[in-house]
Amino acid sequence: MTRENIPTSNVPNVPPRILMGPGPSDAHPRVLQAMMSHMIGYLDKDFMLILDEVSALLKNVFMTKTNLTLALSGTGSSGMEAGLSSLLEPDDTVIICANGFFSERMIDMATRIGANVIALKSEWGEPFPPELLQQELANHSKVKLVTAIHAETSTGILQPLEDLSKLTKDNEALFMVDAVTSLGGQRVAVDEWNIDYCYSATQKCLGCPPGLSPAALSPQAHERIKTRTHKPVSWYLDLSLIANYWGFEHVYHHTAPVSMILGLREGLRIVLEEGLETRFHRHSKNASALAAGLEALGLS
């Protein structure tokens, strides 16, 4: 094929835009600059130090001291599927607190794994009521996992997690939380709320391009994975293998997205430079101002 015959876009250079949709958000210029750094091997000793730094930065943002923190190669859905496929075996019972689009995706994924899925559905646009979970847990003695969405992208609802977590722990199940939309913009207190597996994505409140799913894994969740009867159905999303790469031993699993990880490191630095509480306040203040402006226009 000659150069003249190569298909070209009618818009070869997309102009800069201010992104105001549900995601991705605009990437910080410092993040984009960091991603332009020269390439380095994913097993280079200096890159291992970068992984350790990213893990430490994630501990601060996830508000955890004991959890293993890492970033999966893929968007937030990879974090979702990694958690479900690693923590559930066929016929395990999982309760999914469903009040929006992405909890419906959880139901689909868990069903494909072969789990016994209990889909507790409540009204979209409203927080999930803890009493529904309490009633269902009273009817099932062998629930292995309970899942919830912290900030549901499809409706904008921020879900209180303390009551859901307590009910889950009182029934000796693991608690998995989707923080794709909230991490870096709202408080995500993994240790305080006893979350066993929490995952997010880089393209929203962390100010990075899409492509990584930061996650925090509790010792209890890690032990559940290590003592499985069968290997997870997904090799690529097996959290035990990914943890071996991000952990102390740094055992090769797959080719890590070096540039994305460099960008995430810079994005996390920016988050912590601003300060978590300051950042949370800014997001809440701006969200309230936007809502007030829309209501003033007669929108709801």
How should each PLM-predicted stretch be described?
Residues 16-73, 77:
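A glycine-/small-polar-enriched, mobile loop at the entrance of the PLP active site in fold-type I
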Residues 1-14:
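Basic/polar N-terminal segments that are highly enriched at the extreme N-terminus
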Residues 19-21, 70-73, 96, 119-120, ...:
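General beta-strand structural signal in soluble alpha/beta enzymes
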Residues 26-27, 203-291:
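Active-site C-terminal subdomain of aminotransferase-like
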Residues 127-184, 197:
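Active-site phosphate-binding strand-loop segment of PLP-dependent enzymes
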Residues 67-99, 103-108:
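Conserved beta-loop-alpha segment that forms the PLP phosphate-binding cup at the N-terminus of a helix
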Residues 191-203:
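Conserved active-site segment immediately N-terminal to the catalytic lysine
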